[in-house]
């Protein structure tokens, strides 16, 4: 039906007859001459309809926004002074010879150039929203990014292999989406949270290098960077060390950013998990922010201020200081707002000291309600360790280490961007390595896996699996960029005896091991090769590339933060016949639970 896309037209086509198909983005009547901006996925083209062609002009008069049109005409230069440098076709226009309305449109629920639209309105009318140039640019970039991943992986010997969507429910950290089986009453499939076990089995089967751009599912509470179904670039390889996997992956990400958005990423420094938490309170720190945390726990063990002394002498407590250069000018209102902010992360308060005169380590030089209850030695230690100068402010976090890290880590980012404590770099990648294998869950009184139960411990820490799991480090690595986790992975356990020890450390007994992971343990006994890999969140990567506020802006049909699709009204109820076929009966009071096995 057409010869060209609108965005492909340029001055080189001057004098040629072209046929375009698309939508009327805007129609303007200028004193007897009608201009139609025709839009398709590649861009806009200006079409000129003059009264000399009466039939064509009459149709043009009836055209309204979002009419679907087919237009044939002659390419010609725009008159002097009317070119548009913002358009690929901005030097030319189309003199309309023929116009056909392929389908008229009712009045759209909003104009495509409206800025102040609520997200719910956009998601309810997603088809119209997807016509907006910004959304089309986002999804085109998503395609280019996926293509760049595929090209690199194909060129480096990776094989694209599909893994099952209907699989077994296994504990991987989040709730599974369950699918009831009609032919096996009372039993359920689960939608995969990742292809983790299947890609490991493919390595055991000898496929050496695997990849897949795949949908994954997690039934978890949503945030700006989460969706119940999301896309990851999943990678696994055999006979490669931790360092070799990271080197190949770094080359992959550099290639993808260069091909997709023409960005040359800077060096990828490496930092241990312990250092990242110590200095930044985060395992995915934004290195563009120059503020850092300073450890001062030991300085407050003997002070009169019980809030600090209690934490300093407790197991698992941490007191960290964060120096804000020039922060003594912060108002009481600003400090109160920051105090309220850290409360989101469980902090009970936000102590501070204004450094009016760094040479006087007393109430004259230091201004704060807590100074009188702190010793000169403790105050001197804080000033020296933070490097505080006159005119600075020091914030303190004092609580369990996790709360301090979460609260001050988030405050660091907030103040850093609000007050301009950032470097000029646009991109700041970072490898975080040497993660702990386990973390202790106080609520369940047991160890849990920091990554997943299939991550290999460091060779020199194998004995710690039994003797001291808390000190055991993993062959795990995460790639962070600008404070976002782009992806993460690990070398996997390839010996069944080691896998059994890790399960035991996680309080998964022999019977449960066989019931849930027997197929994996058996496979590892058949000469499983050393293997490892990682996965990248495609949605997050494209979000960063576009600068979008939410990953919902780079997904064609996303769910809301309540895990709903407003366009199709999903999830929705089903009729009684379908429930009977699945051997499910809803409780009288509508709840999320179901009773299984009842006809």
Curated annotation (Swiss-Prot):
Disulfide bonds: none
Entry's EC annotation: 6.1.1.23
Keywords, ordered alphabetically: Aminoacyl-tRNA synthetase, ATP-binding, Cytoplasm, Ligase, Nucleotide-binding, Protein biosynthesis
Residues that coordinate or bind L-aspartate: 172, 218, 451, 492
Location(s), subcellular: Cytoplasm
Enzymatic class: ligase
Reactions listed under catalytic activity: tRNA(Asx) + L-aspartate + ATP = L-aspartyl-tRNA(Asx) + AMP + diphosphate
One annotated GO biological process: aspartyl-tRNA aminoacylation
Record GO terms (molecular function): aspartate-tRNA ligase activity; aspartate-tRNA(Asn) ligase activity; ATP binding; nucleic acid binding
Predominant cellular place of this UniProt entry's protein: cytoplasm
Region (Aspartate): 196-199
Self-association state and partner proteins as the record states: Homodimer.
Family statement: Belongs to the class-II aminoacyl-tRNA synthetase family. Type 1 subfamily.
HAMAP family per record: Asp_tRNA_synth_type1 (MF_00044)
Full protein name: Aspartate--tRNA(Asp/Asn) ligase
Species, as recorded: Dechloromonas aromatica (strain RCB)
């Amino acid at each position: 039906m057409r010869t060209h896309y609108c965005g492909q037209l340029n001055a080189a086509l001057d004098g040629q007859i072209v046929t375009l198909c698309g939508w009327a983005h805007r129609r303007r009547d200028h004193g007897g001459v009608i201009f139609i901006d025709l839009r398709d996925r590649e861009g806009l083209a200006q079409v000129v309809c003059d009264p000399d062609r009466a039939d064509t002009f009459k149709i043009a008069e009836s055209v309204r926004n979002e009419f679907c049109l087919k237009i044939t005409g002659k390419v010609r230069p725009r008159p002097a002074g009317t070119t548009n440098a913002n358009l690929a076709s901005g030097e030319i226009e189309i003199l309309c010879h023929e116009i056909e309305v392929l389908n008229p449109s009712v009045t759209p629920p909003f104009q495509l150039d409206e800025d102040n639209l609520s997200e719910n309105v956009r998601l309810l009318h997603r088809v119209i929203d997807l016509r907006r140039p910004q959304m089309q640019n986002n999804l085109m970039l998503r395609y280019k990014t996926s293509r760049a991943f595929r090209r690199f992986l194909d060129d480096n010997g990776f094989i694209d292999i599909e893994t099952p969507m209907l699989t077994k429910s296994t504990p991987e950290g989040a709730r599974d989406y369950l699918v009831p089986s009609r032919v096996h009453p009372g039993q359920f499939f689960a939608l995969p949270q990742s292809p983790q076990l299947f890609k490991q089995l493919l390595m055991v089967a000898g496929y050496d290098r695997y990849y897949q751009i795949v949908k994954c599912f997690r039934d978890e509470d949503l945030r700006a960077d989460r969706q119940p179904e999301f896309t990851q670039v999943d990678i696994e390889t055999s006979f490669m060390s931790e360092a070799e996997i990271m080197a190949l992956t770094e080359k992959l990400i550099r290639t993808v950013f260069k091909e997709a958005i023409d960005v040359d990423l800077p060096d990828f420094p490496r930092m241990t998990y312990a250092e990242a938490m110590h200095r930044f309170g985060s395992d995915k720190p934004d290195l563009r922010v120059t503020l850092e945390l300073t450890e001062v726990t030991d300085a407050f063990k003997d002070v009169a201020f019980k809030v600090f002394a209690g934490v300093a002498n407790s197991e698992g407590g941490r007191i960290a200081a964060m120096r804000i250069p020039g922060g003594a000018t912060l108002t009481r209102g600003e400090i109160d707002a920051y105090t309220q902010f850290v409360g989101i992360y469980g902090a009970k308060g936000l102590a501070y000291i204004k450094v009016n005169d760094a040479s006087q380590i007393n109430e004259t030089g230091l201004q704060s309600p807590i100074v009188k209850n702190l010793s000169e030695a403790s105050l001197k230690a804080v000033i020296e360790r933070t490097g505080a100068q006159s005119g600075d402010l020091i914030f303190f976090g004092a609580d369990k280490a996790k709360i301090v890290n979460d609260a001050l880590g988030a405050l660091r980012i907030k103040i850093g961007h609000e007050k301009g404590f950032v470097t000029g770099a646009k991109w700041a990648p970072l490898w975080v390595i040497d993660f702990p294998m386990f973390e202790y869950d106080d609520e369940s009184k047991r160890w849990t896996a920091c990554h997943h139960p299939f991550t290999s411990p460091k060779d020199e820490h194998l004995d710690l699996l039994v003797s001291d799991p808390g000190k055991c480090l993993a062959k795990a690595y995460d790639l962070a960029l600008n404070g976002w986790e782009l992806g993460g992975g690990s070398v996997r356990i390839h010996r069944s005896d080691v896998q059994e020890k890790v399960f035991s450390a996680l309080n998964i007994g022999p019977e449960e091991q066989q019931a849930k992971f027997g197929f994996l343990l058996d496979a590892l006994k058949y000469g499983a090769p050393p293997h490892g890999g990682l996965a990248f969140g495609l949605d997050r990567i494209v979000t960063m590339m576009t600068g979008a506020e939410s990953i919902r802006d780079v997904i064609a049909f996303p769910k809301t933060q309540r895990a709903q699709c407003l366009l199709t009204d999903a999830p929705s109820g089903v009729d009684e016949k379908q429930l009977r076929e699945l051997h499910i009966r809803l409780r009288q009071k509508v709840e999320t639970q179901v009773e299984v096995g009842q006809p």
